Every structure is written in structure tokens, then in C-alpha cells.
């Protein structure tokens, strides 16, 4: 029968030794070190070794290694660009020669006329 002390008291655990020892040693009680850190204001005896256990939240558990290579789905992080109709204004230059109704031959350069054209580019 093992006498287990309260977790808040800084006393060591007491347990009987295992059956692998001689019968003379089985009747003796063996003091085990306190593995639970004391949270009370009492000072621990100098003979007890204090080995605090880290809380479970601080323990890192490594992932299981598997022989099979698992394919991780790739996530497309680039956004799809939807084209929208953007009205643009382009200057269209008409370089065609404007001929007047005259029997004379025009030796000058053809006149250029500029018209504003609005189109939608998709």
C-alpha cells in the first residue's frame, strides 16, 4: 500500500519496493523523491530532491513519422483578375486628303482632321 502525499504538501511519496528484492527489503519502506513541485509557502526539506514537471502546455509532442509521403494540397494564393470594361478615349487622326471641287490640282500636303472616338476595351 502506497501512501501518496497531497500535491500541495512538500513531503515525499512512500511506496513499497517491488517483488524483485529480497524478502528482508520488501518489509522496508522506501522514500521516493517528491516529483510534484510544492506550491505552498512551506519550505521543502533539504534532503528531498525537487524535480518540477513542466506543465503539459509547455511540452512539445513531435508528430508521428510515416513512411508514406502524403501529398499536401496546394492552395492557389493568387487572386483571379476579372476584366472590367474600361472606357478609353483615343484620338483618331484622319490623314485622307480632302479634295475640294476645283479643277486645280492641290500641291499642298493633305489636311489632317482629328476626331474623338470613345471605345470600351475588355
Curated annotation (Swiss-Prot):
Polar residues: compositionally biased ranges: 73-89, 111-122
Superkingdom of source: Eukaryota
InterPro entries according to UniProt: Casein_kappa
Residue positions where Phosphothreonine is found in the record: 98
Keywords: Glycoprotein, Milk protein, Phosphoprotein, Secreted
Localization: Secreted
Broad class of the protein's primary localization: secreted
Function: Kappa-casein stabilizes micelle formation, preventing casein precipitation in milk.
Protein name: Kappa-casein
Amino acid at each position: 500500500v502506497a501512501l501518496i502525499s497531497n500535491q500541495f504538501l512538500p513531503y515525499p511519496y512512500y511506496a513499497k519496493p517491488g517483488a524483485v528484492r529480497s524478502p528482508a527489503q520488501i518489509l522496508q519502506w522506501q522514500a521516493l523523491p517528491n516529483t510534484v513541485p510544492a506550491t505552498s509557502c512551506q519550505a521543502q526539506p533539504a534532503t528531498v530532491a525537487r524535480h518540477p514537471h513542466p506543465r503539459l502546455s509547455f511540452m512539445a509532442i513531435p508528430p508521428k513519422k510515416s513512411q508514406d509521403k502524403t501529398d499536401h494540397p496546394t492552395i492557389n494564393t493568387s487572386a483571379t483578375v476579372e476584366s472590367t470594361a474600361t472606357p478609353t478615349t483615343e484620338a483618331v487622326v484622319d490623314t485622307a486628303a480632302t479634295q475640294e471641287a476645283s479643277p486645280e490640282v492641290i500641291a499642298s500636303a493633305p489636311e489632317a482632321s482629328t476626331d474623338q472616338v470613345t471605345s470600351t476595351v475588355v
